[in-house]
């Protein structure tokens, strides 16, 4: 049996509208992107990890810490767009999009979202995402928290920065996406072709 190649990509941009320079923010003497990269190296299923950026400052910091980095276009509007470009340049069977602003990302979550897409019974699934229940009521109305509606079978149906679902009976269960996605190569190809 041939082993699948699984690559983790950490999109990182300097020009965030809410927090410019966030990937380089100091956390206990190291930049945030370093912490994310180190956590990703603890995931058991990733064969390689890259930081994907369009910013020379981020590249230089990554180089100084011996982190693999790939320069991408500065026209991307989402991390998944940046991931798609990386997939066109890095040959792999699966790509995992790891948020660059999650310095405490759980390596087990990375493995879990990756494992979902590796299961042979899920051969028709081209992407897998991670979500969790919202426990802090303020997150429900926070537009910085992306909410997700989940079907009874655990499939994401819709994403929104608004409070969804609307609590008709006052008993809605809210979930937030973790910004952690695993794609089969063909899933990223579909995504790239359908991005406006």
Q: Residue ranges of each PLM-predicted region?
A:
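Short, high-confidence coil segments that cap the C-terminus of an alpha-helix
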Residues: 46, 92, 122-125
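Hydrophobic/aromatic residues located in beta-strands of well-ordered beta-sheets
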Residues: 8, 49-51, 95, 128, ...
């Amino acid at each position: 049996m041939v082993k699948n190649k699984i690559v983790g990509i950490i999109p990182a941009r300097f020009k965030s509208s809410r927090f410019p320079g966030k990937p380089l923010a100091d956390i206990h003497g190291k930049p945030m992107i370093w912490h994310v990269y180190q956590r990703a190296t603890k995931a058991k299923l990733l064969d390689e990890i890259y930081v994907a950026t369009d910013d020379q400052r981020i590249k230089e910091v990554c180089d100084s810490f011996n982190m693999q980095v790939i320069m991408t276009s500065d026209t991307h509007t989402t991390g998944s767009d940046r991931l798609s470009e990386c997939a066109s340049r890095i040959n792999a069977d699966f790509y995992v999009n790891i948020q660059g602003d999650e310095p405490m990302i759980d390596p087990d979550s990375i493995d879990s979202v990756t494992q979902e897409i590796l299961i042979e019974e899920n051969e028709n699934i081209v992407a897998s995402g991670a979500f969790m229940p919202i426990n802090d009521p303020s997150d429900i109305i926070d537009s910085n928290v992306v909410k997700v509606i989940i079907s009874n079978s655990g499939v994401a149906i819709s994403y929104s920065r608004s409070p969804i679902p609307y609590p008709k009976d006052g008993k809605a269960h809210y979930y937030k996406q973790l910004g952690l996605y695993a794609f089969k190569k063909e899933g990223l190809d579909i995504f790239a072709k359908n991005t406006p």
